[in-house]
């Protein structure tokens, strides 16, 4: 049995990983362990990649799982607009590494202002929408889209994409 360890105990990230494994019809054991990302609570741009990779590395070291999975949300200034997205990073115990990125979405100036004052995206969302702990529920994307797209949905596709070299090799016996 393959064991995949997620570097988070956030229920949205755990449920997104479960859904991705279900979509792929992979009967893998999933464990969620909180590990350090090594980046600020609100990563910007390249730090999002660093945080996701660090989570994958740290969780595989702590658990000795077959696969380490790190998910890190971040924001970045692109052409004068602040966007939010997530990076999903996978590392196998054999050293194979791959990553994928979620869809990106622009943030309203009210959120950007709070983020630039030192708030995390989730905190900024909670302040603006008068919610509590939205990062463990629908997330900023859910609040902004009236839950047409929520945080879990945003994560499922990049999890599938980050894992493809692993499950495709296992199913089809093809090299990466």
Curated annotation (Swiss-Prot):
Gene3D superfamilies: 3.90.950.10
Keyword Ligase annotated: no
InterPro entries the UniProt entry points to: ITPase-like_fam (IPR029001), Non_canon_purine_NTPase (IPR002786), NTPase/PRRC1 (IPR026533), YjjX_NTPase (IPR050299)
UniProt cofactor(s): Mg(2+); Mn(2+)
Keyword Protein biosynthesis: no
Enzyme class, first EC level, given as a word: hydrolase
Catalysed transformations (reactions): XTP + H2O = XDP + phosphate + H(+); ITP + H2O = IDP + phosphate + H(+)
Pfam family, one: NTPase_I-T
Molecular-function GO term, any one: ribonucleoside triphosphate phosphatase activity
Cofactor stoichiometry and binding remark: Binds 1 divalent metal cation per subunit; can use either Mg(2+) or Mn(2+).
Enzyme Commission identifier(s): 3.6.1.73
GO biological process terms held by the UniProt record: nucleotide metabolic process; thiamine metabolic process
UniProt binding sites for Mg(2+): 36
Keyword field: Hydrolase, Magnesium, Manganese, Metal-binding, Nucleotide metabolism, Nucleotide-binding
Protein family (similarity comment): Belongs to the YjjX NTPase family.
Subunit field text: Homodimer.
HAMAP family listed in its UniProt record: Non_canon_purine_NTPase_YjjX
Function: Phosphatase that hydrolyzes non-canonical purine nucleotides such as XTP and ITP to their respective diphosphate derivatives. Probably excludes non-canonical purines from DNA/RNA precursor pool, thus preventing their incorporation into DNA/RNA and avoiding chromosomal lesions.
Name by which UniProt lists this protein: Probable inosine/xanthosine triphosphatase
